[in-house]
């Protein structure tokens, strides 16, 4: 790695059309898992002008019977969950309003051929829901053990949303994007060279005093989020660089579930296996294995075993045991990477890295997913049942295994 370089990451807000779709999909996951912790869910959402469409495959007790008939009242609950999600995001606009939008539900039963490969039976453990590779990452650039550019990009937009909802920035609307460029020296972020923030706004905030008010507000937020000394007179600012941004959200661009996988993870600072998270129950290793590898990488860094850690894991559909586990500390490790791999596999309280073991250890069979669907799945605060993959409760086990 070069000693001096620039690196950029972006985030998008909860009101971005793709994130609206992600949150709706995860609201459906939460609804179904709340009824049946073993529910199988693959829910895709399309959002566009005054319309939300669901499609995908589901299975679960109290949700749909084996003949594909919905349980009484469940279709109304699905629609209510969709509208409530859009309402909480804040869309009450002519082109997209939680109360007046048209809703279509095309969810149907899960394929029996997929189910037979995934379900546990007899002496066979539950298999992975699909083949694939998943990555986890952690580094010591921020207190959250996340790459700094994506961490700051998320926090900027989260602050905008908080201020919009509590009335401190009533001129803001839900759709926004951020992008932060940092200069690194000797592998550490030391300065911000550029900030891009595009935020949907009320009428009139694209010129004159109102535009100046919006720009000044955004600069205050960014200055509050970034570490002292990162901003300077040399920092380039691009705030609503295209001008007017009144039409936004699904009315401005169609949204789809699973199109912001780099925003959801590490902002391009680490590899990605390609699988999206939202709309998937935790038997899908695209989701659960990405969570466990983040958890493991974060605990490696938190234990002081490395300052950077990438972990890859791979699965085959219908097979419970992972095909491979790979640890790379990028030359920052205090012990051999292979020893860390061995320690992970030997830690008894993990219970292994099968899909069932991951879900059990992290407590993933709970309705905890909608909150993860905006502002990043990683670098969040583990609180109660939420974001269990952000816990650092494996630190002492790793230290003991490698002593």
From Swiss-Prot:
Residues annotated for ATP binding in this entry: 16, 175-177, 253, 259-260, 276, 280
Q: Which residues bind L-methionine?
A: 57, 110, 253, 284
> Which cofactors?
Mg(2+); K(+)
- Which residues are listed for Mg(2+) binding in this entry? 18
Q: Which GO terms describe its molecular function?
A: ATP binding; magnesium ion binding; methionine adenosyltransferase activity
| Cofactor binding, note field | Binds 2 divalent ions per subunit. Binds 1 potassium ion per subunit.
Cellular component, GO annotation: cytoplasm
What are the recorded Gene Ontology BP terms?
one-carbon metabolic process; S-adenosylmethionine biosynthetic process
Q: Keyword Nuclease, does the record have it?
A: no
Q: What Pfam families does the annotation carry?
A: S-AdoMet_synt_C, S-AdoMet_synt_M, S-AdoMet_synt_N
**Which InterPro entries has this protein been placed in?**
ADOMET_SYNTHASE_CS, S-AdoMet_synt_C, S-AdoMet_synt_central, S-AdoMet_synt_N, S-AdoMet_synthetase, S-AdoMet_synthetase_sfam
What keywords appear on the UniProt entry?
ATP-binding, Cytoplasm, Magnesium, Metal-binding, Nucleotide-binding, One-carbon metabolism, Potassium, Transferase
* Enzyme Commission numbers on file: 2.5.1.6
Sequence positions that bind K(+): 44
Its predominant location is cytoplasm
Give the span(s) annotated as Flexible loop: 110-120
- Which reactions fall under this protein's catalytic activity? L-methionine + ATP + H2O = S-adenosyl-L-methionine + phosphate + diphosphate
User: Coiled coil: present as a keyword of the record?
Assistant: no
| Compartments it resides in | Cytoplasm
Q: In which pathway does it act?
A: Amino-acid biosynthesis; S-adenosyl-L-methionine biosynthesis; S-adenosyl-L-methionine from L-methionine: step 1/1
Biological role: Catalyzes the formation of S-adenosylmethionine (AdoMet) from methionine and ATP. The overall synthetic reaction is composed of two sequential steps, AdoMet formation and the subsequent tripolyphosphate hydrolysis which occurs prior to release of AdoMet from the enzyme.
* Protein family per UniProt: Belongs to the AdoMet synthase family.
Subunit and interaction comment: Homotetramer; dimer of dimers.
This protein's name: S-adenosylmethionine synthase
What is the organism lineage in this UniProt record?
Bacteria, Pseudomonadati, Pseudomonadota, Alphaproteobacteria, Sphingomonadales
